[in-house]
Curated annotation (Swiss-Prot):
Protein name per Swiss-Prot or TrEMBL: Acetyl-coenzyme A carboxylase carboxyl transferase subunit beta, chloroplastic
Gene that specifies this protein: accD
Function in brief: Component of the acetyl coenzyme A carboxylase (ACC) complex. Biotin carboxylase (BC) catalyzes the carboxylation of biotin on its carrier protein (BCCP) and then the CO(2) group is transferred by the transcarboxylase to acetyl-CoA to form malonyl-CoA.
Keywords, comma-separated and alphabetical: ATP-binding, Chloroplast, Fatty acid biosynthesis, Fatty acid metabolism, Lipid biosynthesis, Lipid metabolism, Metal-binding, Nucleotide-binding, Plastid, Transferase, Zinc, Zinc-finger
Subcellular location(s) of the protein: Plastid, Chloroplast stroma
Protein backbone atom coordinates (compact mmCIF):
# COMPACT_ATOMS: atom_id res chain seq x y z
CA UNK A 1 0.00 0.00 0.00
CA UNK A 2 1.33 3.44 -0.92
CA UNK A 3 0.95 6.20 1.64
CA UNK A 4 0.30 9.76 0.64
CA UNK A 5 0.74 12.84 2.78
CA UNK A 6 -0.24 16.46 2.36
CA UNK A 7 3.14 18.21 2.25
CA UNK A 8 2.00 21.79 2.50
CA UNK A 9 -0.76 24.26 1.94
CA UNK A 10 0.00 26.89 -0.69
CA UNK A 11 -2.63 29.54 -0.07
CA UNK A 12 -4.80 30.53 2.84
CA UNK A 13 -7.59 32.90 1.99
CA UNK A 14 -10.42 34.05 4.20
CA UNK A 15 -13.45 31.82 3.83
CA UNK A 16 -15.94 32.88 1.21
CA UNK A 17 -19.17 33.19 3.15
CA UNK A 18 -21.36 31.99 0.31
CA UNK A 19 -19.87 29.00 -1.39
CA UNK A 20 -20.65 25.91 -3.41
CA UNK A 21 -18.84 22.59 -3.49
CA UNK A 22 -18.57 20.29 -6.47
CA UNK A 23 -16.60 17.10 -5.91
CA UNK A 24 -15.05 16.23 -9.25
CA UNK A 25 -14.92 12.50 -8.65
CA UNK A 26 -13.91 11.66 -12.20
CA UNK A 27 -10.26 11.31 -11.16
CA UNK A 28 -11.03 9.32 -8.05
CA UNK A 29 -11.98 5.71 -7.78
CA UNK A 30 -13.47 3.70 -4.91
CA UNK A 31 -13.01 5.04 -1.43
CA UNK A 32 -13.05 2.55 1.40
CA UNK A 33 -12.23 2.48 5.07
CA UNK A 34 -9.44 -0.10 5.44
CA UNK A 35 -7.45 1.39 8.30
CA UNK A 36 -6.15 -1.00 10.94
CA UNK A 37 -7.25 1.26 13.80
CA UNK A 38 -11.06 1.17 14.08
CA UNK A 39 -11.09 4.37 16.15
CA UNK A 40 -9.42 6.34 13.39
CA UNK A 41 -11.33 7.47 10.32
CA UNK A 42 -9.37 7.54 7.07
CA UNK A 43 -9.95 8.16 3.41
CA UNK A 44 -8.37 5.74 0.95
CA UNK A 45 -8.21 6.78 -2.68
CA UNK A 46 -7.92 4.36 -5.62
CA UNK A 47 -7.20 4.96 -9.28
CA UNK A 48 -5.33 8.25 -9.36
CA UNK A 49 -5.40 9.94 -12.74
CA UNK A 50 -2.86 8.44 -15.19
CA UNK A 51 -1.35 6.09 -12.58
CA UNK A 52 -1.77 2.39 -13.28
CA UNK A 53 0.52 1.20 -10.50
CA UNK A 54 -1.26 3.06 -7.72
CA UNK A 55 -3.50 1.01 -5.54
CA UNK A 56 -4.66 3.22 -2.70
CA UNK A 57 -3.52 5.92 -0.35
CA UNK A 58 -3.73 6.81 3.27
CA UNK A 59 -4.12 10.58 3.49
CA UNK A 60 -3.30 12.81 6.45
CA UNK A 61 -3.95 16.52 6.47
CA UNK A 62 -2.27 19.58 7.81
CA UNK A 63 -4.84 21.05 10.17
CA UNK A 64 -7.65 20.23 12.55
CA UNK A 65 -11.38 20.83 12.44
CA UNK A 66 -10.87 24.29 13.91
CA UNK A 67 -9.12 25.28 10.64
CA UNK A 68 -12.04 24.31 8.43
CA UNK A 69 -12.47 27.91 7.33
CA UNK A 70 -9.05 27.75 5.68
CA UNK A 71 -9.68 24.35 4.14
CA UNK A 72 -12.94 25.29 2.43
CA UNK A 73 -11.47 28.01 0.23
CA UNK A 74 -9.18 28.45 -2.76
CA UNK A 75 -6.31 26.23 -1.60
CA UNK A 76 -3.72 24.04 -3.27
CA UNK A 77 -1.98 21.09 -1.60
CA UNK A 78 1.21 19.25 -2.53
CA UNK A 79 1.01 15.46 -2.24
CA UNK A 80 4.04 13.14 -2.42
CA UNK A 81 4.24 9.36 -2.37
CA UNK A 82 7.02 7.15 -1.03
CA UNK A 83 8.76 7.19 -4.42
CA UNK A 84 8.98 10.97 -4.43
CA UNK A 85 6.35 11.43 -7.14
CA UNK A 86 4.46 14.65 -6.48
CA UNK A 87 0.92 15.71 -7.24
CA UNK A 88 -1.02 18.91 -6.70
CA UNK A 89 -4.49 18.90 -5.21
CA UNK A 90 -6.43 22.02 -6.15
CA UNK A 91 -9.55 22.97 -4.20
CA UNK A 92 -11.47 26.00 -5.49
CA UNK A 93 -14.86 26.76 -3.90
CA UNK A 94 -15.61 29.76 -6.10
CA UNK A 95 -15.33 27.79 -9.35
CA UNK A 96 -16.58 24.46 -7.95
CA UNK A 97 -13.32 22.56 -8.57
CA UNK A 98 -11.63 19.71 -6.71
CA UNK A 99 -8.83 18.36 -8.90
CA UNK A 100 -5.63 16.32 -8.70
CA UNK A 101 -2.92 17.03 -11.27
CA UNK A 102 0.74 16.27 -11.94
CA UNK A 103 2.14 19.62 -13.07
CA UNK A 104 5.92 19.53 -12.61
CA UNK A 105 6.47 23.25 -13.16
CA UNK A 106 3.89 24.10 -10.57
CA UNK A 107 5.26 21.54 -8.13
CA UNK A 108 8.79 22.87 -8.46
CA UNK A 109 7.56 26.33 -7.59
CA UNK A 110 5.54 24.92 -4.72
CA UNK A 111 8.46 22.95 -3.26
CA UNK A 112 10.70 25.99 -3.50
CA UNK A 113 8.13 28.15 -1.73
CA UNK A 114 7.91 25.76 1.20
CA UNK A 115 11.55 24.69 1.41
CA UNK A 116 12.22 26.82 4.49
CA UNK A 117 9.01 25.60 6.14
CA UNK A 118 10.02 21.95 5.72
CA UNK A 119 13.50 22.63 7.09
CA UNK A 120 11.97 24.31 10.11
CA UNK A 121 9.65 21.36 10.63
CA UNK A 122 12.49 18.85 10.41
CA UNK A 123 14.54 20.74 12.94
CA UNK A 124 11.65 20.77 15.37
CA UNK A 125 10.60 17.16 14.93
CA UNK A 126 13.86 15.41 13.99
CA UNK A 127 14.43 12.91 11.20
CA UNK A 128 12.07 9.94 11.14
CA UNK A 129 14.44 7.47 9.53
CA UNK A 130 12.81 4.54 11.21
CA UNK A 131 9.54 5.15 9.35
CA UNK A 132 9.68 3.26 6.00
CA UNK A 133 7.04 5.59 4.55
CA UNK A 134 8.89 8.78 5.54
CA UNK A 135 11.34 10.50 3.18
CA UNK A 136 12.79 13.95 2.51
CA UNK A 137 9.70 15.00 0.60
CA UNK A 138 7.32 14.38 3.49
CA UNK A 139 6.65 15.38 7.07
CA UNK A 140 4.19 14.01 9.54
CA UNK A 141 1.23 16.00 10.80
CA UNK A 142 -0.41 15.94 14.22
CA UNK A 143 -3.93 15.34 12.88
CA UNK A 144 -5.28 12.50 10.77
CA UNK A 145 -7.78 12.76 7.95
CA UNK A 146 -10.97 12.26 9.96
CA UNK A 147 -13.46 11.72 7.24
CA UNK A 148 -14.58 12.34 3.75
CA UNK A 149 -14.64 15.99 2.69
CA UNK A 150 -18.33 16.19 3.50
CA UNK A 151 -17.49 15.55 7.14
CA UNK A 152 -15.36 18.68 7.03
CA UNK A 153 -18.39 20.63 5.92
CA UNK A 154 -20.33 18.82 8.61
CA UNK A 155 -17.86 20.04 11.22
CA UNK A 156 -18.11 23.51 9.75
CA UNK A 157 -21.86 23.47 10.29
CA UNK A 158 -21.21 22.41 13.88
CA UNK A 159 -19.18 25.60 14.38
CA UNK A 160 -22.47 27.47 13.81
CA UNK A 161 -21.09 29.68 11.08
CA UNK A 162 -23.77 30.37 8.51
CA UNK A 163 -22.95 29.46 4.92
CA UNK A 164 -24.88 29.29 1.69
CA UNK A 165 -23.66 26.09 0.09
CA UNK A 166 -24.54 23.59 -2.57
CA UNK A 167 -23.16 20.07 -2.24
CA UNK A 168 -23.10 18.32 -5.57
CA UNK A 169 -21.90 14.78 -5.97
CA UNK A 170 -20.23 13.35 -9.06
CA UNK A 171 -23.60 12.22 -10.34
CA UNK A 172 -24.99 15.73 -9.72
CA UNK A 173 -27.50 14.31 -7.27
CA UNK A 174 -27.77 16.00 -3.89
CA UNK A 175 -29.17 12.83 -2.40
CA UNK A 176 -25.76 11.12 -2.76
CA UNK A 177 -24.20 13.41 -0.18
CA UNK A 178 -23.90 12.52 3.49
CA UNK A 179 -24.34 16.12 4.58
CA UNK A 180 -27.48 16.29 2.42
CA UNK A 181 -28.95 13.31 4.25
CA UNK A 182 -27.90 14.70 7.61
CA UNK A 183 -29.47 18.11 7.02
CA UNK A 184 -32.61 16.83 5.32
CA UNK A 185 -33.03 13.79 7.53
CA UNK A 186 -33.97 11.64 4.56
CA UNK A 187 -32.51 8.83 2.51
CA UNK A 188 -30.70 9.29 -0.76
CA UNK A 189 -32.89 9.38 -3.80
CA UNK A 190 -30.38 7.04 -5.48
CA UNK A 191 -29.96 3.47 -4.32
CA UNK A 192 -27.82 3.23 -1.19
CA UNK A 193 -26.98 0.57 1.35
CA UNK A 194 -26.89 1.29 5.07
CA UNK A 195 -25.36 -1.16 7.51
CA UNK A 196 -25.05 0.07 11.10
CA UNK A 197 -23.21 3.38 11.10
CA UNK A 198 -21.73 2.86 7.62
CA UNK A 199 -23.17 4.37 4.42
CA UNK A 200 -22.21 3.31 0.89
CA UNK A 201 -23.11 5.72 -1.89
CA UNK A 202 -22.69 5.10 -5.59
CA UNK A 203 -21.35 8.00 -7.64
CA UNK A 204 -19.87 8.38 -11.09
CA UNK A 205 -16.87 6.05 -11.15
CA UNK A 206 -16.54 5.72 -7.40
CA UNK A 207 -17.86 4.07 -4.27
CA UNK A 208 -17.94 6.04 -1.05
CA UNK A 209 -18.10 4.35 2.32
CA UNK A 210 -18.48 6.90 5.07
CA UNK A 211 -18.15 5.96 8.73
CA UNK A 212 -20.17 8.36 10.81
CA UNK A 213 -20.97 8.57 14.47
CA UNK A 214 -24.46 8.99 15.84
CA UNK A 215 -23.28 12.15 17.60
CA UNK A 216 -22.41 13.82 14.27
CA UNK A 217 -25.83 12.96 12.88
CA UNK A 218 -27.58 14.30 15.95
CA UNK A 219 -25.65 17.56 15.76
CA UNK A 220 -26.41 18.15 12.10
CA UNK A 221 -30.08 17.37 12.66
CA UNK A 222 -30.20 20.50 14.78
CA UNK A 223 -29.45 22.63 11.71
CA UNK A 224 -32.26 21.37 9.49
CA UNK A 225 -34.25 24.52 10.19
CA UNK A 226 -31.53 26.61 8.52
CA UNK A 227 -32.14 25.12 5.08
CA UNK A 228 -34.92 24.83 2.52
CA UNK A 229 -34.80 21.94 0.06
CA UNK A 230 -35.59 22.64 -3.58
CA UNK A 231 -38.46 20.53 -4.90
CA UNK A 232 -36.88 20.37 -8.35
CA UNK A 233 -33.13 19.76 -7.95
CA UNK A 234 -33.21 18.74 -4.26
CA UNK A 235 -30.52 21.30 -3.51
CA UNK A 236 -30.26 23.06 -0.17
CA UNK A 237 -30.94 26.80 0.02
CA UNK A 238 -29.94 28.77 3.07
CA UNK A 239 -33.21 30.05 4.55
CA UNK A 240 -31.76 33.37 5.68
CA UNK A 241 -31.00 34.37 2.08
CA UNK A 242 -34.02 32.72 0.47
CA UNK A 243 -36.52 35.48 1.26
CA UNK A 244 -34.32 38.15 -0.33
CA UNK A 245 -34.21 35.96 -3.45
CA UNK A 246 -38.03 35.73 -3.57
CA UNK A 247 -37.90 32.02 -2.66
CA UNK A 248 -36.21 31.14 -5.95
CA UNK A 249 -33.72 28.25 -5.84
CA UNK A 250 -30.16 29.45 -6.33
CA UNK A 251 -29.11 26.22 -8.01
CA UNK A 252 -31.80 25.75 -10.66
CA UNK A 253 -34.02 28.86 -10.54
CA UNK A 254 -37.10 26.89 -9.49
CA UNK A 255 -39.87 28.95 -7.87
CA UNK A 256 -40.38 27.53 -4.38
CA UNK A 257 -43.53 28.00 -2.31
CA UNK A 258 -44.04 31.35 -0.61
CA UNK A 259 -46.12 32.24 2.40
CA UNK A 260 -49.01 34.65 1.96
CA UNK A 261 -47.23 37.26 4.07
CA UNK A 262 -44.14 37.10 1.85
CA UNK A 263 -46.28 37.50 -1.27
CA UNK A 264 -48.03 40.53 0.20
CA UNK A 265 -44.64 42.02 1.03
CA UNK A 266 -43.51 41.30 -2.54
CA UNK A 267 -46.50 42.92 -4.28
CA UNK A 268 -47.79 45.63 -1.93
CA UNK A 269 -45.96 48.89 -1.27
CA UNK A 270 -44.56 49.18 2.28
CA UNK A 271 -46.90 50.79 4.77
CA UNK A 272 -50.01 50.55 2.57
CA UNK A 273 -51.37 47.12 3.57
CA UNK A 274 -54.76 47.20 5.31
CA UNK A 275 -56.04 43.66 6.10
CA UNK A 276 -59.73 42.71 6.13
CA UNK A 277 -61.71 40.19 8.21
CA UNK A 278 -58.69 39.00 10.22
CA UNK A 279 -60.85 37.78 13.09
CA UNK A 280 -62.96 35.40 10.98
CA UNK A 281 -62.33 31.75 11.96
CA UNK A 282 -63.87 28.34 11.21
CA UNK A 283 -66.28 26.78 13.73
CA UNK A 284 -66.40 23.16 12.53
CA UNK A 285 -69.91 23.49 11.02
CA UNK A 286 -70.48 19.76 10.38
CA UNK A 287 -68.58 18.56 13.47
CA UNK A 288 -66.08 16.63 11.43
CA UNK A 289 -63.95 14.25 13.50
CA UNK A 290 -61.29 11.91 12.21
CA UNK A 291 -59.53 9.13 14.07
CA UNK A 292 -56.25 11.03 14.02
CA UNK A 293 -57.20 14.55 15.10
CA UNK A 294 -60.44 16.55 15.42
CA UNK A 295 -60.95 19.25 12.80
CA UNK A 296 -61.02 22.04 15.38
CA UNK A 297 -57.72 20.86 16.84
CA UNK A 298 -56.17 20.86 13.38
CA UNK A 299 -57.34 24.43 12.81
CA UNK A 300 -55.81 25.49 16.13
CA UNK A 301 -52.58 23.70 15.28
CA UNK A 302 -52.20 25.45 11.93
CA UNK A 303 -53.07 28.80 13.47
CA UNK A 304 -50.20 28.40 15.92
CA UNK A 305 -47.86 27.14 13.23
CA UNK A 306 -48.50 29.84 10.61
CA UNK A 307 -49.71 32.76 12.68
CA UNK A 308 -52.77 33.01 10.41
CA UNK A 309 -56.44 32.55 11.24
CA UNK A 310 -57.29 30.93 7.89
CA UNK A 311 -55.81 29.84 4.55
CA UNK A 312 -56.24 33.25 2.88
CA UNK A 313 -55.29 36.83 3.67
CA UNK A 314 -57.41 39.59 2.16
CA UNK A 315 -57.03 43.34 2.26
CA UNK A 316 -56.43 46.64 0.51
CA UNK A 317 -53.06 48.05 -0.47
CA UNK A 318 -51.14 49.94 -3.11
CA UNK A 319 -49.14 48.36 -5.92
CA UNK A 320 -46.67 50.96 -7.21
CA UNK A 321 -49.08 53.59 -5.93
CA UNK A 322 -52.18 52.00 -7.49
CA UNK A 323 -54.91 51.09 -4.95
CA UNK A 324 -55.82 47.40 -5.29
CA UNK A 325 -57.89 44.78 -3.50
CA UNK A 326 -55.88 41.60 -3.07
CA UNK A 327 -56.42 38.13 -1.66
CA UNK A 328 -53.49 35.76 -1.14
CA UNK A 329 -53.96 32.08 -0.35
CA UNK A 330 -51.45 30.29 1.86
CA UNK A 331 -50.63 26.64 1.11
CA UNK A 332 -48.98 26.23 4.51
CA UNK A 333 -52.39 26.47 6.19
CA UNK A 334 -54.06 23.07 5.61
CA UNK A 335 -52.81 22.98 2.02
CA UNK A 336 -54.59 26.23 1.20
CA UNK A 337 -57.88 24.34 1.24
CA UNK A 338 -61.03 26.37 0.63
CA UNK A 339 -63.56 26.18 3.45
CA UNK A 340 -66.49 28.40 4.34
CA UNK A 341 -64.29 31.08 5.92
CA UNK A 342 -61.95 31.22 2.92
CA UNK A 343 -64.93 31.53 0.58
CA UNK A 344 -66.56 34.22 2.72
CA UNK A 345 -63.39 36.31 2.98
CA UNK A 346 -62.81 36.21 -0.78
CA UNK A 347 -66.47 37.03 -1.49
CA UNK A 348 -66.36 40.03 0.84
CA UNK A 349 -63.14 41.21 -0.80
CA UNK A 350 -64.73 41.06 -4.26
CA UNK A 351 -67.82 42.94 -3.09
CA UNK A 352 -65.68 45.62 -1.44
CA UNK A 353 -63.60 46.03 -4.60
CA UNK A 354 -66.78 46.37 -6.66
CA UNK A 355 -68.16 49.07 -4.37
CA UNK A 356 -64.86 50.99 -4.24
CA UNK A 357 -64.11 50.51 -7.98
CA UNK A 358 -60.77 48.84 -7.30
CA UNK A 359 -58.86 46.35 -9.45
CA UNK A 360 -58.77 42.87 -7.96
CA UNK A 361 -55.90 40.39 -7.55
CA UNK A 362 -56.30 36.87 -6.18
CA UNK A 363 -53.15 34.77 -5.73
CA UNK A 364 -54.16 31.10 -5.79
CA UNK A 365 -52.29 28.34 -3.95
CA UNK A 366 -54.66 25.58 -2.91
CA UNK A 367 -55.35 21.89 -2.91
CA UNK A 368 -59.05 22.55 -3.50
CA UNK A 369 -62.20 22.44 -1.40
CA UNK A 370 -61.79 21.50 2.28
CA UNK A 371 -63.25 18.05 2.85
CA UNK A 372 -63.73 18.65 6.59
CA UNK A 373 -66.57 21.05 5.77
CA UNK A 374 -68.35 18.86 3.23
CA UNK A 375 -70.82 20.52 0.87
CA UNK A 376 -70.36 23.89 2.58
CA UNK A 377 -66.88 24.10 1.10
CA UNK A 378 -68.19 23.13 -2.35
CA UNK A 379 -70.75 25.95 -2.20
CA UNK A 380 -67.92 28.48 -1.91
CA UNK A 381 -67.11 27.83 -5.56
CA UNK A 382 -70.56 29.03 -6.63
CA UNK A 383 -70.61 31.92 -4.16
CA UNK A 384 -67.27 33.35 -5.29
CA UNK A 385 -68.12 32.85 -8.97
CA UNK A 386 -71.40 34.71 -8.48
CA UNK A 387 -69.62 37.65 -6.85
CA UNK A 388 -67.10 37.73 -9.70
CA UNK A 389 -69.93 37.75 -12.25
CA UNK A 390 -71.27 40.98 -10.75
CA UNK A 391 -67.76 42.46 -10.44
CA UNK A 392 -66.68 41.69 -14.01
CA UNK A 393 -69.85 41.86 -16.11
CA UNK A 394 -72.02 44.36 -14.24
CA UNK A 395 -69.35 46.66 -12.77
CA UNK A 396 -66.97 46.19 -15.73
CA UNK A 397 -63.96 46.01 -13.41
CA UNK A 398 -60.61 44.29 -13.85
CA UNK A 399 -59.72 40.98 -12.15
CA UNK A 400 -56.26 39.36 -12.37
CA UNK A 401 -55.86 35.74 -11.28
CA UNK A 402 -52.34 34.57 -10.37
CA UNK A 403 -51.87 30.80 -10.29
CA UNK A 404 -48.98 29.51 -8.19
CA UNK A 405 -47.83 26.02 -7.36
CA UNK A 406 -49.96 24.14 -6.56
CA UNK A 407 -53.39 25.27 -7.74
CA UNK A 408 -55.80 22.35 -7.97
CA UNK A 409 -59.34 21.17 -7.29
CA UNK A 410 -62.19 23.57 -6.60
CA UNK A 411 -60.01 26.68 -6.81
CA UNK A 412 -58.96 25.78 -10.36
CA UNK A 413 -62.58 24.99 -11.23
CA UNK A 414 -63.87 28.35 -9.97
CA UNK A 415 -62.23 31.73 -9.43
CA UNK A 416 -58.74 30.54 -10.42
CA UNK A 417 -59.71 30.38 -14.09
CA UNK A 418 -62.13 33.34 -14.17
CA UNK A 419 -59.59 36.15 -14.36
CA UNK A 420 -59.71 38.75 -17.12
CA UNK A 421 -55.97 38.12 -17.21
CA UNK A 422 -54.65 34.78 -15.93
CA UNK A 423 -50.99 34.76 -14.90
CA UNK A 424 -49.05 31.64 -13.92
CA UNK A 425 -45.70 31.35 -12.19
CA UNK A 426 -42.92 29.38 -13.91
CA UNK A 427 -43.04 25.62 -13.25
CA UNK A 428 -46.33 25.94 -11.36
CA UNK A 429 -48.33 22.75 -10.84
CA UNK A 430 -51.87 23.50 -12.03
CA UNK A 431 -54.62 20.90 -12.37
CA UNK A 432 -58.17 20.01 -11.43
CA UNK A 433 -57.42 16.48 -10.20
CA UNK A 434 -53.92 15.75 -9.01
CA UNK A 435 -51.62 13.24 -10.64
CA UNK A 436 -51.94 10.69 -7.83
CA UNK A 437 -55.75 10.89 -7.83
CA UNK A 438 -55.95 10.40 -11.60
CA UNK A 439 -53.57 7.44 -11.61
CA UNK A 440 -55.33 5.70 -8.72
CA UNK A 441 -58.80 6.33 -10.14
CA UNK A 442 -58.22 5.58 -13.82
CA UNK A 443 -55.25 3.26 -13.37
CA UNK A 444 -53.41 5.23 -16.05
CA UNK A 445 -50.08 7.00 -15.96
CA UNK A 446 -50.21 10.79 -16.22
CA UNK A 447 -47.49 12.02 -18.63
CA UNK A 448 -44.67 13.86 -16.92
CA UNK A 449 -45.05 17.63 -17.17
CA UNK A 450 -48.61 17.52 -18.51
CA UNK A 451 -49.82 19.55 -15.51
CA UNK A 452 -46.98 22.08 -15.54
CA UNK A 453 -47.58 25.73 -16.34
CA UNK A 454 -45.35 25.72 -19.43
CA UNK A 455 -47.23 22.84 -21.05
CA UNK A 456 -50.65 24.30 -20.22
CA UNK A 457 -49.57 27.71 -21.53
CA UNK A 458 -48.91 26.14 -24.93
CA UNK A 459 -52.48 24.82 -24.84
CA UNK A 460 -53.84 28.34 -24.28
CA UNK A 461 -54.86 27.97 -20.64
CA UNK A 462 -53.10 31.15 -19.45
CA UNK A 463 -52.32 34.59 -20.77
CA UNK A 464 -48.88 35.01 -19.24
CA UNK A 465 -46.12 33.17 -17.39
CA UNK A 466 -44.33 35.78 -15.30
CA UNK A 467 -41.31 35.26 -12.99
CA UNK A 468 -41.59 36.70 -9.51
CA UNK A 469 -39.00 39.41 -10.00
CA UNK A 470 -41.09 40.89 -12.85
CA UNK A 471 -44.56 40.27 -11.44
CA UNK A 472 -45.11 43.60 -9.69
CA UNK A 473 -44.07 45.69 -12.69
CA UNK A 474 -46.18 43.56 -15.06
CA UNK A 475 -49.25 44.01 -12.86
CA UNK A 476 -48.62 47.75 -12.68
CA UNK A 477 -48.53 48.02 -16.48
CA UNK A 478 -51.70 45.95 -16.82
CA UNK A 479 -53.57 48.20 -14.39
CA UNK A 480 -52.44 51.33 -16.20
CA UNK A 481 -53.57 49.80 -19.48
CA UNK A 482 -57.02 49.36 -17.94
CA UNK A 483 -57.13 52.96 -16.66
CA UNK A 484 -56.08 52.31 -13.07
CA UNK A 485 -53.37 54.82 -12.19
CA UNK A 486 -51.35 55.69 -9.07
CA UNK A 487 -53.08 58.07 -6.70
CA UNK A 488 -50.78 61.03 -7.38
CA UNK A 489 -51.12 60.67 -11.16
CA UNK A 490 -54.90 60.32 -10.86
CA UNK A 491 -55.23 63.48 -8.78
CA UNK A 492 -53.02 65.45 -11.18
CA UNK A 493 -55.18 64.33 -14.13
CA UNK A 494 -58.35 65.54 -12.38
CA UNK A 495 -56.77 68.94 -11.79
Amino acid sequence: MERWWFNSMLFKKEFERRCGLNKSMGSLGPIENTNEDPNRKVKNIHSWRNRDNSSCSNVDYLFGVKDIRNFISDDTFLVSDRNGDSYSIYFDIENHIFEIDNDHSFLSELESSFYSYRNSNYRNNGFRGEDPYYNSYMYDTQYSWNNHINSCIDSYLQSQICIDTSIISGSENYGDSYIYRAVCGGESRNSSENEGSSRRTRTKGSDLTIRESSNDLEVTQKYRHLWVQCENCYGLNYKKFLKSKMNICEQCGYHLKMSSSDRIELLIDPGTWDPMDEDMVSLDPIEFHSEEEPYKDRIDSYQRKTGLTEAVQTGIGQLNGIPVAIGVMDFQFMGGSMGSVVGEKITRLIEYAANQILPLIIVCASGGARMQEGSLSLMQMAKISSALYDYQLNKKLFYVSILTSPTTGGVTASFGMLGDIIIAEPNAYIAFAGKRVIEQTLNKTVPEGSQAAEYLFQKGLFDLIVPRNLLKSVLSELFKLHAFFPLNQKSSKIK
